[in-house]
């Protein structure tokens, strides 16, 4: 949203096949009728499938399909879609699903840079470490770590630090997102954190 406010053309690409939810977070669930599989298979164009935000027209969403079985995602088609996105937008933010399945592989195939987002939970840090290992083919300096839901109280209780998360993932730290109870409230209602001036958006 900050990029869109600066006049940049931004596309949010949801790669969470069958379990998409980025449309809900952006308040676009009733408008996202076509998905990236429709573009890949030639049923519509990228421009037709990408849904612009009503209040922020330079911010658009290309959602994931609600498929009940794995899709046939060929690398040449994905690369062609990536080229078209680069020509049409200044930024493409790809939301990869948890795990190392088809959606993750698609995101990794199309991305130029990667941000691994984790929390200070032990299980989350282990997942981040595994994800970082899968991304070892990316050039040095293109994969970074963001630690979310950080509160001083939780850090004291768990006897963990941000350094532990960095060491576990083996990635350079890009930033830290503080714990904010208003985040789930906004997500459930499709509200924009930045508009409400909530803590995590400052």
Where are these regions (language model features)?
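Conserved nucleotide-binding/hydrolysis micro-motifs of P-loop NTPases
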Residues: 17-19, 67-68, 121-123, 150-154, ...
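Conserved C-terminal guanine-recognition region of P-loop GTPase G domains, centered on the G4
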Residues: 125-140
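C-terminal lobe/tail of nucleotide-utilizing enzymes
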Residues: 137-202
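A conserved segment at the C-terminal end of the G1
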Residues: 1-15
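Inter-motif core of Ras-like GTPase G domains
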Residues: 86-89, 101-122
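Gly/Ala-rich phosphate-binding loop of Rossmann-like dinucleotide-binding domains
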Residues: 4, 108, 136
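P-loop/Walker-type NTP enzyme "switch/lid" segment
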Residues: 12-87, 184-189, 193-194
């Amino acid at each position: 949203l900050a990029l869109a406010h600066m006049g940049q053309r931004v596309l949010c690409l949801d790669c969470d096949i069958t379990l998409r939810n980025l449309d809900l977070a952006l308040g676009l669930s009733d408008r996202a009728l076509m998905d990236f599989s429709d573009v890949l298979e030639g049923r519509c164009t990228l421009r037709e499938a990408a849904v612009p935000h009503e209040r922020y027209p330079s911010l658009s969403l290309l959602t994931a399909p609600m498929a009940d079985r794995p899709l046939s995602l060929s690398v040449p088609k994905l690369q062609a879609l990536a080229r078209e996105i680069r020509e049409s937008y200044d930024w493409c933010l790809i939301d990869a699903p948890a795990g190392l399945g088809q959606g993750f592989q698609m995101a990794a195939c199309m991305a130029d840079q990667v941000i691994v987002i984790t929390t200070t939970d032990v299980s989350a840090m282990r997942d981040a470490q595994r994800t970082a290992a899968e991304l070892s083919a990316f050039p040095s300096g293109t994969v970074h770590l963001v630690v979310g839901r950080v509160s001083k109280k939780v850090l004291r209780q768990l006897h963990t630090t941000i350094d532990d998360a960095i060491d576990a993932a083996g990635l350079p730290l890009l930033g830290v997102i503080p714990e904010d109870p208003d985040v789930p409230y906004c997500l459930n209602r499709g509200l924009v954190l930045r508009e409400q001036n909530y803590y995590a958006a400052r």
